[in-house]
From Swiss-Prot:
Keyword Cell membrane: yes
Family: Belongs to the MG414/MG415 family.
Gene Ontology cellular component list: plasma membrane
Protein name: Uncharacterized protein MG414
Intracellular or extracellular location(s): Cell membrane
UniProt entry keywords in alphabetical sequence: Cell membrane, Membrane, Transmembrane, Transmembrane helix
Annotated membrane topology: Multi-pass membrane protein
Originating species: Mycoplasma genitalium (strain ATCC 33530 / DSM 19775 / NCTC 10195 / G37) (Mycoplasmoides genitalium)
TM region(s), chain numbering: 4-24, 1004-1024
């Protein structure tokens, strides 16, 4: 799309007739000025340059060293008041205050439009806001309004340099008298003057100034050059227009047009190249200079500036009044003569004032009618304005050109510089008109944010290039309400374009009066954001152009951010030409070794930079990153820092997650080597041999598994160390236990960052009760030390540690609650759960086997089962022979106390058949407590409660035992055999109770003694009778 910047020359006097070399029908080129008719009552005119879009974008660079600049000490800067530049600076700081104080709107040397009926090629604006552009922020009282005009002023600078041909810059050049220059010019009275000057004479250069003696041309004749002469002619407006090359901004805020026109002609014969025109430079050398390598050469360059000057404002009164001094030196001014032809005048300010009085019509055009947009005259013979109607002139202009205006207005809290620009373009119905705006960067950035769906939201799990997915590329998007509002504006614009009654369609923007909020719910958000109202026509115009502005800006913008990654600060690209470019994989190389070892992706966002190609006013640097994080602050991966925001989570592209796959770290039995139990390990000073270290390293490695079978944990086997007391690291851990085969070791993992969780000082638990982080190596951060809980299948146990436990329909043989075998109730067979080896403190006897059978029967009695008598338990050789039978009736408990052996016997009896037998030791401590001690480990097998009837029986049995020791229960106890604490308070028997008991005993003894005596007497009498009968019978 081709577009041309129209730089208006806000003048009341146009350029001379000699500019009429180009016509309206010609293609636009850089070096032509176009004039075209569009007059309103023939009272105003406009002229302007057309620069190609690509030329303007690439070459309009004030800092480009290719653009030659005049000497900074130019005459204009010395004499011109700086009041206007101060006003610009003040305006930049406080826009609304300037509006109030000065009652006008500053547009930075670009004029504005009023009361012009121009057809703007936009389908939704029929007649340019009712034919009027008003001043924003100014009351509509034309009688006291201020306006300003602009003129061209130009001056020359002659630049010269000495340099030897071969570059020996330190060699001085000595003047030769024969190389004087003959200067010829005109005197003030018109007579000719000829003088000889040396090139170093300052007057020679003064002659080249336009203000010198009104000289219209200067000749410089170089003697001894075979009569060659250089004539320098002061540039005319035609030269200015034809040879304009660069536009820049001067130190005083005005625009300066620089050009290097070839303003010299050669008279006479140019011989042997003693001087030549080479890239607008004049070279002067002595005779036969080509034969002398060291001969110095002097170059002269003539430079002319054409400067766009702000003319003091004019009040709307009968006589023009000047409010500030004008440059005292003479300048070029342009006016319209009586024949409506353009004249150029070299005059002072006083002369200019007089000229303005003579051209009152032009003054009135700028003061009374306020028609700032001047008529563009058609180039032709004599620049004569033809008598045409207003409509025909406007139609002739609009058929070829459109003037487009855009005035950006920002919310109060985002006060920045504002500018207005005009474009002059060919009328092409298929083209979309360009738009111009300035300093809206803060508005755009305030509506950008990170897409929360493109960010990692959890901090626990480590991701790799596969599991992170699309979140490897965090994306920037517009806030939902903003982009939806832009879509609604586009939708309304489309409706207006398709509507016949466009004014009615425009009402869709007014959500308050037309109840449009249901149809366009986001417009209110947009109005509040911009602090604009659709009732204001210029503000509505801005709102309607937002979709185009957004597309224009972001199609050519670059959003970068300064970030801290590792120990370095870098700049990365977030957006370019409306595409996301942020890729996390490109910044891993900047992470520190510790961050890599911690699988840590950590980026601190510090400041934003926003650049727009061709819209330099939109560029902004070191802007806050906060808008991007407004909606994602609550993510656990986002944290506010002192300098910005931190995005931190666990990620490494080649992370190969090693997941826990085992039940525990267990050392199996090996028939080919001497296995160890924990007790044996302690006997040999807790040291592992090389085989045991390699074996445990292998167990650790194979307890984890990853997707890549070729990558394993790298365990440093030499680092394995026995830990006798794990509680010095973690108090909650189970201590070393030789019965269960539990012990602890320290081990180093060289590639610990492959673990599914590598741990830290604040989060040390890797696998609950099995693995814990202890430390990280500072020199090699990937190396970490862990505490492991190991199990060995070789157990060192006491026979009383064996017991049985019923869980649902399963019976387990256990050692100190460690399940080692399972009984199948249907098949009456035992199955060992692990390949255990049991070593006992003492040999396992037949009596021990019977105790184990009783424990099993206690457990089986809950299921009304019982073993037969031919049971064998050979646990050392893992041989168990057992057969189960069913008891249809529930067993009864029988209690018996052996006072002599101090034992309590509890038997389970079923129909005179003993099911099980339990024995306890009885101990009395300090005549205060009776202890029922489980000496054989029955507690873990007892499942039943003592019923009230059994409670009484047990109380009587134990009371009898206590009475033998002159003791009694302090209170009636509640016996619970399942409780680990079977201690009961006792007290001494009272004396009367003892006497009563003694009397009762004595009475019983006497009764027994009497019975015995009676029986003895009765026996003796019966014996005597029997003997007497036997004697009598014998006698007979």
């Amino acid at each position: 799309m081709r577009s041309y910047l129209f730089i208006p020359l806000l003048v009341s006097f146009l350029f001379p007739v000699a500019l009429a070399n180009a016509s309206l029908e010609k293609n636009l080129v850089d070096t032509n000025l176009y004039l075209s008719p569009n007059t309103i009552q023939n009272r105003s005119y406009t002229a302007g340059f057309n620069l190609k879009n690509d030329y303007f974008r690439k070459s309009f660079n004030f800092d480009n060293e290719v653009i030659q600049r005049p000497n900074q000490n130019n005459y204009f800067a010395k004499t011109y008041s700086n009041e206007w530049s101060e006003l610009v600076n003040k305006y930049s700081d406080n826009y609304k205050q300037i509006i109030r104080d000065n009652n006008f709107h500053w547009y930075n040397n670009i004029y504005y439009l009023k009361n012009i009926k121009l057809k703007i090629e936009s389908s939704y604006i029929a007649h340019a806001f009712s034919s009027t552009f008003r001043y924003p922020g100014i009351r509509n009282s034309w009688s006291s309004d201020i306006h300003s005009e602009q003129r061209f002023y130009f001056h020359s600078q002659a630049i010269s340099n000495f340099f030897p041909r071969d570059g020996h810059t330190n060699e001085k050049w000595t003047e030769v008298p024969s190389r004087n220059i003959e200067i010829t010019g005109t005197n003030p009275d018109g007579s000719w003057n000829k003088s000889w000057y040396k090139p170093d004479n300052p007057y020679f250069w003064d002659l080249t100034k336009p203000s010198h003696k009104k000289a219209y041309f200067i000749e410089a004749k170089f003697v001894h050059m075979w009569g060659s002469t250089l004539r320098m002619i002061k540039p005319t407006p035609e030269d200015v227009i034809r040879n304009i090359k660069w536009l820049r901004k001067g130190n005083n805020g005005n625009y300066v047009i620089d050009f290097n026109a070839p303003m010299w002609y050669y008279l006479g014969q140019e011989s042997r190249g003693f001087f030549a025109d080479w890239k607008n430079n004049i070279f002067v050398a002595p005779d036969f200079w080509w034969g002398l390598a060291m001969t110095p050469i002097r170059a002269y360059r003539f430079w002319w500036d054409l400067e766009l000057v702000k003319v003091p404002p004019v009040f709307e009164q009968n006589n023009a009044q000047w409010n500030e001094p004008f440059p005292g030196r003479s300048s070029w001014f342009f006016s319209i003569n009586s024949n409506k032809q353009v004249d150029a005048h070299w005059m002072s300010i006083n002369e200019f004032k007089e000229k303005m009085k003579k051209d009152r019509k032009i003054i009135e055009a700028f003061t009374n009618n306020r028609e700032i947009t001047q008529t563009i005259l058609r180039l032709g013979n004599g620049l004569v304005v033809r008598p045409e109607t207003e409509d025909s002139r406007r139609e002739a202009f609009n058929s070829k050109w459109d003037i487009f205006k855009h005035t950006p207005i920002l919310p109060e809290q985002e006060v920045v510089h504002h500018q207005i620009s005009f474009y002059l373009r060919q009328n092409n119905p298929d083209e979309v008109l360009p738009i111009s705006f300035s300093n809206l960067s803060k508005l755009w950035i305030s509506q950008l944010e990170f897409d929360i769906n493109s960010l990692v939201s959890q901090t626990e799990k480590t991701l790799n290039k596969e599991t992170i997915g699309t979140k490897i590329k965090p994306t920037i998007k517009f806030k939902d309400k903003f982009i939806n509002a832009i879509k609604e504006v586009s939708l309304i614009n489309q409706r207006i374009d398709e509507s016949i009654d466009k004014n009615e369609a425009l009402k869709s923007f007014n959500i308050s009066t037309n109840n449009q909020s249901n149809f366009y719910p986001n417009l209110d958000y947009l109005y509040n954001l911009l602090q604009m109202s659709p009732n204001n026509k210029e503000e509505l115009f801005f709102i309607r152009n937002l979709p185009r502005m957004v597309k224009t800006i972001f199609d050519r913008s670059t959003l970068t951010v300064k970030v801290k990654i590792g120990n370095s600060v870098n700049e990365i690209t977030l957006l370019r030409n409306n595409k996301n470019y942020f890729d996390l994989s490109s910044i891993e190389e900047f992470l520190t070794e510790k961050q890599k070892a911690d699988n840590e992706m950590n980026i601190e966002f510090l400041a934003l930079n926003f650049f727009v190609d061709g819209y330099e006013s939109e560029n902004i640097s070191n802007y806050s990153v906060e808008p991007l994080f407004d909606s994602i602050k609550k993510l656990s991966t986002i944290k506010r820092t002192k300098d910005g925001f931190e995005y931190k989570f666990k990620y490494r592209k080649d992370f190969n997650e090693q997941r826990w796959i085992a039940k525990d770290f267990r050392i199996p039995l090996n028939k080919n080597v001497q296995n160890f139990n924990v007790a044996e390990l302690k006997k040999r000073n807790e040291k592992f041999n090389d085989y045991e270290k390699r074996q445990m390293a292998f167990i650790i490695k194979n307890s984890f598994k990853s997707k890549d079978k070729n990558i394993d944990l790298d365990i440093n086997s030499n680092s394995l160390t026995f830990v006798d007391n794990p509680k010095k690291y973690f108090k909650h851990l189970e201590p070393t236990n030789e019965k269960k085969g539990i012990f602890y070791v320290l081990a180093e993992i060289n590639n610990s960052n492959e673990l599914f969780k590598y741990g830290s000082e604040s989060d040390s638990e890797i696998i609950k009760d099995k693995m814990y982080f202890l430390s990280q190596n500072q020199k090699n951060p990937k190396l970490r030390t862990y505490l492991f809980k190991f199990h060995t299948n070789k157990l060192f146990v006491d026979k009383n540690d064996l017991g049985f436990k019923l869980e649902k329909d399963k019976v387990f043989l256990s050692v100190d609650n460690l399940k080692i075998a399972e009984l199948d109730l249907k098949s009456s067979s035992f199955k060992f759960l692990e390949d255990y080896q049991l070593d006992f403190h003492e040999p396992f006897s037949l009596n021990d086997e019977q105790l184990l059978v009783d424990k099993l029967n206690i457990t089986l009695s809950e299921k009304r089962l019982q073993t037969t008598k031919n049971v064998r338990f050979n646990l050392k050789n893992k041989f168990i022979n057992i057969h189960l039978v069913e008891n249809k009736n529930q067993f009864n408990l029988v209690f018996d106390v052996d006072v002599r052996s101090k034992k309590l016997f509890i038997k389970g009896v079923n129909n005179d058949n003993q099911v099980f037998s339990i024995s306890y030791d009885l101990k009395i401590t300090n005549n205060q407590t009776l202890l029922i001690v489980d000496a054989n480990g029955f507690d873990n097998s007892i499942w039943f409660d003592i019923t009230s009837e059994n409670q009484t029986q047990l109380f009587k049995a134990l009371s009898f035992y206590l009475k033998q020791n002159n003791l009694q229960f302090k209170r009636v106890p509640d016996f619970n055999l399942k409780s680990q604490d079977k201690s009961y308070e006792v007290d001494k028997l009272e004396k009367n109770e003892i006497k009563k008991q003694d009397t009762n005993v004595e009475l019983i003894l006497w009764v027994i003694f009497g019975i015995i005596i009676s029986l003895m007497i009765s026996s003796a009498v019966l014996f005597l009778k029997w003997r007497k009968k036997k004697i009598v019978k014998k006698r007979n």
